[in-house]
Design a protein with these regions (language model features):
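Structural signature of the two symmetry-related core transmembrane helices
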Residues: 84-99, 290-305, 384
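Central cavity-lining transmembrane alpha-helices of secondary-active solute carriers
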Residues: 57-74, 266-278
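Juxtamembrane intracellular "pre-TM" segments in multi-pass secondary transporters
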Residues: 1-20, 200-230
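Helix-loop boundary and gating motifs at the non-cytosolic
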Residues: 6-65, 225-265
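Hydrophobic core of transmembrane alpha-helices in multi-pass small-molecule transporters
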Residues: 28, 96, 107-123, 234, ...
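Intracellular juxtamembrane helix-capping segments at the cytosolic ends
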Residues: 122-135, 327-340
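C-terminal membrane-cytosol helix-exit motif in multi-pass small-molecule transporters
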Residues: 185-205, 390-398
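Helix-to-loop junctions at the C-terminal end of transmembrane segments
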Residues: 69-81, 166, 275-287, 371
Length: 404
């Protein structure tokens, strides 16, 4: 059976557009680089002197900058090319790792977090555009989950490698974590070179049409349930912008060491490696809305386990179930790509970026306030509440729109 699935996966890849395949190669490198350090960013900035509230403010400021810069990315990608925008995003992430590496204060470390948020947001806008322009509607979830399966493999290994390196360099302090950011910078530079040399534009850029505001107006006129989907996007992505509290909570409250935090992240990505492709096939076959509704409770269970965990093993299980959020996010992203005509994907992704950006500004401030005033565990209860609201909104969207 494994051989059959692998063979079908290779056959699927062979018939895809070159841009889709090169983007997978790029993701393999960039995700390893991100996986070395992402789970340690909040801990690193904390080691430089920031507390939970400061972490929230730093993330919120990064969200403001990210929102202002990434809203026009989709529109610019339509006009000047997806390739140029992806190169820009990778360049910003490279600068973020350099800022982390040079940081001697939490403010400079916060600059690194802000730049990372901006660069990551660029990729979140542009990467789905590659899938949107190269994959057929009836196999889009399968293709996106296949990409996620293949490119999640480095993230299985990277956190454990990071834990070993941190231990070797002196432990979970600023000096022990700093070398990882230099390694990540080198990896991101390689990913940038791959895109620069080999990634073609999946669709030729066109400078026809009006301004970015006119593009947004066209999306609302010609799209399907656009306003409701934007509200859904805002609610459903709150966990993305409070995720930095998970490793911080594991270390500060549960006393997790570098290896436990690394294994939590590896377990998170194991969900993608082993379940992404089956989830994609089942979503395309039996319904995307049903699949999101099935996956979300597992993510909520992960948050409960994180709070009540009596030992390291339960923390790692929580990390595994936390990965179900990503499985659901990819499935719902495929729904979003089909709500507007293909020629409007740039403007549509820009609007989605705006909605996520607003959340990235507000959510960290709310999270910091909740942590300081009510208690750390209430941050995760708040996240569970957002997912309940998300499912309520999703249920109001007809199955004819979500393909089941």
């Amino acid at each position: 059976m494994l051989r059959s699935v692998t063979s079908k996966g290779f056959d699927f890849l062979r018939r895809q557009h070159r841009a889709f395949k090169v983007n997978i190669y790029r993701n393999l490198i960039s995700k390893f680089s991100i996986g070395l350090t992402q789970q340690y960013q909040s801990i690193y900035v904390s080691a430089l002197g920031a507390g939970a509230v400061e972490l929230g403010y730093v993330s919120s400021v990064g969200g403001v900058a990210s929102t202002l810069l990434t809203v026009p990315v989709g529109w610019l990608a339509d006009r000047y090319g997806i390739r140029k925008m992806l190169i820009t995003g990778l360049g910003v992430m490279l600068m973020s790792f350099l800022a982390f590496g040079l940081a001697q204060s939490w403010q400079v470390g916060g600059l690194g977090m802000g730049l990372f948020t901006m660069g990551f947001s660029f990729a979140m806008v542009v990467c789905p555009m590659i899938c949107g322009h190269t994959l057929r509607n009836e196999e889009r979830v399968t293709g996106m989950q296949l990409c996620d399966t293949v490119t999640a493999l480095p993230r299985l290994v990277a956190p454990v490698v990071a834990a070993y390196l941190i231990t070797s360099f002196g432990g979970m302090n600023a000096g022990g974590m700093r070398p990882l950011f230099w390694i990540s910078a080198a990896g991101m530079l390689v990913a940038l070179v791959i895109v620069y040399l080999w990634l073609p534009n999946p669709i030729e850029p066109s400078r026809k049409g009006g301004s970015i505001i006119q593009g947004f107006g066209s999306v609302f006129r010609e799209g399907t349930m656009v306003a409701r989907w934007l509200v859904y996007t805002m609610i459903s992505t709150v966990p993305m912008y409070l995720a930095f509290y998970i490793p911080y909570y594991a270390k500060e409250i549960k006393g997790a060491d570098p290896y436990v935090i690394g294994l939590m992240d590896s377990a998170y990505w194991a969900s993608s490696v082993f379940l992404a492709l089956p989830v994609g096939v089942l979503a395309d076959r039996y319904g995307r809305k049903r699949m999101v509704a099935l996956l979300t409770p597992f993510y909520c269970l992960a948050l409960v386990l994180l709070v009540v965990s009596p030992n390291d093993a339960v923390l790692i299980v929580a990390g595994l179930l936390n990965g179900f959020f990503m499985l659901g996010a990819i499935t719902q992203a495929a729904i979003g790509l089909e709500l507007v005509p293909r020629e409007m994907l740039g403007s549509w992704n820009g609007l989605n970026s705006l909605s996520r950006g607003l959340v990235s500004i507000a959510a960290p401030v709310i999270g910091g306030f909740v942590w300081a005033s009510l208690g750390p565990e209430y941050v995760f209860y708040f996240l569970i509440a957002t997912q309940v609201v998300k499912l309520g909104i999703l249920w109001t969207i007809p199955s004819s729109v979500t393909r089941g």
